[in-house]
Each structure stands twice: as structure tokens, then as C-alpha cells.
Amino acid sequence: MNSVSFEDVAVNFTLEEWALLDSSQKKLYEDVMQETFKNLVCLGKKWEDQDIEDDHRNQGRNRRGHMVERLCESRKGSKCGETTSQMPNVNINKETSTGAKPHECSFCGKDFMHHSSLNRHMRSHIGQKPNEYQEYEKQPCKRKAVGKTFSYRHCVRKHERTHTGGKPYECKQCGKAFIYYQPFQRHERIHAGEKPYECKQCGKTFIYYQSFQKHAHTGKKPYECKQCGKTFICYQSFQRHERTHTGEKPYECKQCGKAFSCPTYFRTHERTHTGEKPYKCKECGKAFSFLSSFRRHKRTHSGEKPYECKECGKAFFYSASFQAHVITHTGARPYKCKECGKAFNSSNSCRVHERTHIGEKPYECKRCGKSFSWSISLRMHERTHTGEKPYECKQCHKTFSFSSSLREHETTHTGEKPYECKQCGKAFRFSSSLQRHERTHSAEKPYECKQCGKAFRCSSYFRIHERSHTGEKPYECKQCGKVFIRSSSFRLHERTHTGEKPYECKLCGKAFSFSSSLREHEKIHTGNKPFECKRCGKAFLRSSQIRLHERTHTGEKPYQCKQCGKAFISSSKFRMHERTHTGEKPYRCKQCGKAFRFSSSVRIHERSHTGEKPYECKQCGKAFISSSHFRLHERTHMGEKA
């Protein structure tokens, strides 16, 4: 008897003919083709296994054969017991270049080119998973049923690799290996810069089809959550959302046990263990673990600020900064801490705050072992080891380790103060400064030290205070080895080596190393002394001066020398005294190399080289190097004895 192939008995339609059939006729056609195929299988016909996951390898593969394979996979089993992994390479529907999609989903109305695609899609509605995975032990006859089910047989084969650890697809450029071909193919696009999916409406291109689908201008969101009614463009987003209701976290890290609801979050987390940085900047060569970080970094080169506020026109590099800014107009704080009820204007700030309750610090520095509550803090900390300063000011070309430091610096050029207190009208350069200021009105101190109970308005002050208990000094000067508790103190100290004076008085042109010194100096021009002692009425230029002065009334001397027991009103005098014991002379003259205990002493000494005499007597015109010599001279006019 001559062999009969499926092609011999199959009935074919063109797309035009198929479009003329009604739904009952299409259903009848499907049933007949399925029954025909069952009969051929029962006659003992066998075909080579078609590995569906490698469909991409044969670009000319007949789509109709693919459709039959899917169609036949959907049945629960054949009567004669033949395995359905043996599929024919046959034709059912002919595909034309018209782009017509004749198959419509009766649930959501989505259209498909092939019946097999519709069939697969329908399973997302009804939850059908006919293929069951069974894990085999070493003995061929003995098996233990895991019971995990899959919609398609090729998914079973893919799943088996998660048990065997097989990763057959390896990137030739970076050596990364993949279980499945599709992720491997997507990964290769990162190196090539290929973006094959282009939006016909706006021309924007995408590496991944899923990103392209999400971008679509149709506004169609066919996937609706039954619990909250939220709708989604793509099924994967819908699936991820459902897990927020169920709390399911199916992706678990084998190294630390942390679980994730989304595979992308899981893969990103894995890089914290492996140190993998697959995203490399072509301009500066810097590599990144995360695509989002890479995209943000590219904006530092291009200057692009894609997020613009519609109310005030201010533009931002990052969506998080933009969202936080938008809320400053409304005053809304929609994110509330479940433990203490504190509200925040961003979800990120809320998550970070919640870690202060549980003490979680999942990010650890590989160099020094210090751990952090969030990844950005770890990355910022790592720069203290590497000295990296990736953020550059376009006006003066000064570089910074942190984007926040760059933004703060940029306001020194513009003078902009966009954040205004609604209670007193005071304006600030930074939202964090405004938040701290607002607490002076509310007296709120949300950060409490567990060791001594002292509370703080600001998280940064709280962290610095904690170091007074631990003795930690994470900031080390590479030139002299001196260590500091605060990054601000460290940066100020660096200027003693560089001689940098970035703060200039607009009235007289005098420059200062520190902004506080400039502010104090400016008060000399205005004569303003805003800080008045309530006991004696004496007024001061600076708040620090009045605090020290008040101690002369109370007798408080909080700084005591451990070696000799002598106590001091101020920390600066205490530190100066300590040097009499240690012999430390950290301030060195650049011209002659002479070292001094105090910065004031080296400044006075340097004038002996420059000839500068800034203190001039108004009565006789004589000038002096130091203020102390000048004061002694003044007494000669007054008849005083020194």
C-alpha cells in the first residue's frame, strides 16, 4: 500500500477563501483536520521531532506546518497511544503578503494571522496547560512526578534545562550563556546596537518586541485584572501585576534565597552576586549592570533631559526626579509607611524608609564589607574606593562623584532656588533642604538612634551620628591618610591640599574654600548679625558663634581631652589641643615645606612669602600680616600695655 502523507489528504484554503467562511465553517474545518491527523498517527505514521524553540533557525519554515503542530499539541492525547512529539512538516493554511489577520479571539477581540497563534492565545484566557513535566531519576524506569504543567511541549523541554543547568547558547563577545535561544538573540542586540522594531507613527525603535508592543499608540489594553480592574497592553505585564495580589514570588536566588515576582528583577539581582556589567558606554567605556543605569548615564554625555514639568517647564534626566518634582507642586505624599504611617512623595523614598524599621541592608561592598539598604548607596560608596567622578559641570568642568553633588553645584552658577516653604516662604536649592527645613516648623524628628535614643530631623545626620558609636570613618584622604566621619568634612579637607576656593564674594571678589565661610564673610558687608544672645543681648554673625557664646553663660564644656582631662567649649579648640599631645602638624607650606598645627598658622606664614599684609591701621597706615599683631599695634595708639 502506498504511503499517505498529510499533504495528500489535507484541504487548503487561501486567505481570501478563509475570510469567506463563517465561524461554524472554520470550526468544522479545524475538527476535520484534527481528526484526519489523529487517524494518520494511529496508522503508525511518524515524523521527525520539530524543536519549536529553534524555529528561528529556518527562516523559510512553512508556517502552516507550525500551525498543525500547535493544533495537534492542544489535544490531550491520541487513542492509539502514539507520542505527539512526533509532528509532521505539513501545510494547512497558506500565508500571503496581504497582512490580513483572519482569526479573532472571541474573549477580547484580538486578531491573529494563524489559527495556532489564536489557539495559544486562547489558553491565556482558559488557563489550559495540557503538557505535564515529569522529572526522571537516574534509573530509567523509576520516576517521580513533579506535576508542573505547561501549555506547550516545547515549554516542557525548555523547563527541563532549568534542572539540568544546560545553557547551549553562548555569546561570542562576552561569554554569557543562555538556556533559551530567544534571550540569547535579544542579548546579541545589546552588543550590536540593533533595534529591529520601529514604530510607524513616531519612528521610535526598540530592541525588544515586548517594549515595542508596550509603546503602541493604539491605547488598546486587552488584559484586565479581575481583582482591581486595572488593564494592560501585554500579557506579561498582566501576569506580573496579578502577583501583587497573590504575593507570589516564583523566582528565587540560589545564592541568598531572596525571591522575586518578576524574572527581570531576578536577573538584575543576580548581577549583584556575579558583578556582571553587560551594558558598556561607547563614549567613555564605562560598564553597567543595569540597562536603566546605562540609559541614564548616556544622558550625561548627550545632556538630554526628556522629562519636562508642564507647570514650571523644568526638565529632568530621570523619571524618578521628575515624579518627585511634580509632587512639589501638589504637595501630595501618596506613599505611606505601613509601620509608622509616615507619608512620602515617592515610592522609592517610602521603600528606603521602610528599611529603617527592619534594618535590612542587602547590598554589600566587596572591598570593605560595608552593607547598605539600597543599591545606589552602594554604588556611591564604591566611588570612595575608586575615586571615580563621572558627573562634570558643563560651565566650569568641575567633576563630581554623585549626580546630586553636580546638581547642587550647578545651582551656584544659576542661583536658582525652586523649592519654597509654604509656611514661611523661604526658598531652597534642593528638595531635601526644604524637607529638613519643614521639620523646623513641625519639630518632627523621625530618625531615632537605637543606642542612645537621640532623634534627628534628617536621615544623613542620623547616619553620621551612628558613626560616633561605631567609630567608623569611611572617608580617607589619599594624600595624607587622614580619615573622616562625614563626606562634607572630607571634601573640605581636600581643599587644604588643592588650595581650591570655589566660593567668591560678588561684592569684593574675595574667594573662599567653603560656602559657610562665604556666607559669614557676606555678613561683614551687610553688618547683619541675626543671632542674638537672650541673656546678654550680644549679637553674632553665625549660629555657631552664639552656641559657643551661650556656653560661657552655662559653663558647659562638652569636649574633654582623654589624655589630660582638660575640657573645651568648642570642638575646634579641642582638636587643636589634641595636637599638643600628638605633635601632629597637618598643614604644610607649599613653598618652603614648613608644617603647622593650625590652618590659621599656615595662612599667616604664607603671607611672609607673598608679602601680603591685610590688616591696616587707619590712624598711621601701618599694615600687618596677622590680626593679633594688628590688635597689639592698635593698643599703642590707645595707650594700652600689651
Swiss-Prot record:
Domain KRAB: 4-76
Homology family: Belongs to the krueppel C2H2-type zinc-finger protein family.
Native source organism of the sequence: Macaca fascicularis (Crab-eating macaque)
Cellular component terms per the entry's GO annotation: nucleus
Keywords per UniProt: DNA-binding, Metal-binding, Nucleus, Repeat, Transcription, Transcription regulation, Zinc, Zinc-finger
Keyword Repeat: yes
Positions of region (Disordered): 77-99
Role according to the record: May be involved in transcriptional regulation.
Positions with biased composition (Polar residues): 81-99
Major location (coarse): nucleus
Record protein name field: Zinc finger protein 14
Zn-finger region bounds: C2H2-type: 103-125, 141-163, 169-191, 197-217, 223-245, 251-273, 279-301, 307-329, 335-357, 363-385, 391-413, 419-441, 447-469, 475-497, 503-525, 531-553, 559-581, 587-609, 615-637
Subcellular location: Nucleus
GO biological process: regulation of DNA-templated transcription
GO MF annotation terms: DNA binding; zinc ion binding
